[in-house]
Amino acid sequence: MMIKLLGTGDSPGTPILNCHCKTCEDARRKGWERKRFSILVKNGDKFILIDTSPDLRRQLLENNVERVEAVIWTHSHFDHFSGFGEFYRVQENVEVYTTPSIHESIGKFMQFLSYRKREVEEFQSFKISDIEFTLFPVNHPPVDAVGVKIEWNGFKVVVTGDTNSEIDEKSLSEMEKPDLLIANAIAPSGKFRKHMNAKEAMLLGERLGAKKIVLSHLGHFYPPHKSASKLFPVGEDYQEFYFGEGKLYEFFGD
């Protein structure tokens, strides 16, 4: 199994349009960026997406993904679902898994496109391409939102999705002891109503007993990537994690 971070940015991405802060200027000058959040899960020749970002067309083209087996949506904010429209006239009847309430919220925007709704309840496991997934509630007010637990061949990966640090105990129990925790962390510090900061995300990783932590959904509040990576385990676009032979292997995008 392979997991790739297709986008590690927050809703406006980095660099932000019309922003001339140090981080955005560094991104323009040096040619790096943070596309909007999406994760690619690969098993054999099958591809599964966790969220469909506004940058999805580019993300799929640049990673030679011609067809996806399924999509999982974590919540109804545009930076996590709006790229699904890229499947229009490209791939019909994509299977989409999420909770009934999230399906209802996103479905209002997707009436031009036919897809197969797969409604799953929180804490109810389901399989796609021999990988087991479980959705669990997180805290991203005011919308309903879920994180994703991924299990394959004894490995466990947890994606927090967008959430603040106030996650309920039942969800925390579901998240325990992951081999890899992909945690949202919009800024290095500060208090945010909808998101964790890096320090909160790192504390969550320690509490869960995560073997490895990578931070995603990162805003331009961080210093430029090279400097930020010396302070925190910040993810980068197209970073890959391979699971096999009892080990986790990590590779970075170009």
Named regions from a protein language model:
Residues 1-62, 144-161, 180:
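Conserved beta-strand hairpin/beta-sheet module of binuclear metal-dependent hydrolase folds
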Residues 13, 81-82, 106, 190-191, ...:
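Glycine/Thr-rich phosphate-binding loops of Rossmann-like dinucleotide-binding domains
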Residues 17, 61-62, 83-86, 108-110, ...:
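Short amphipathic alpha-helical segments
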Residues 44-98, 177-180:
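Active-site metal-binding motif and surrounding structural segment of the metallo-beta-lactamase
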Residues 49-53, 69-77, 97-99, 157-163, ...:
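Active-site neighborhood of phospho(di)ester-bond hydrolases with catalytic His/Asp-centered motifs
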Residues 53-56, 78, 101-102, 138-143, ...:
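Short beta->alpha connector loops
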Residues 93-146, 152-153, 235-238, 244:
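Metallo-beta-lactamase
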Residues 166-252:
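Cap/insert and terminal regions of metallo-dependent hydrolase folds
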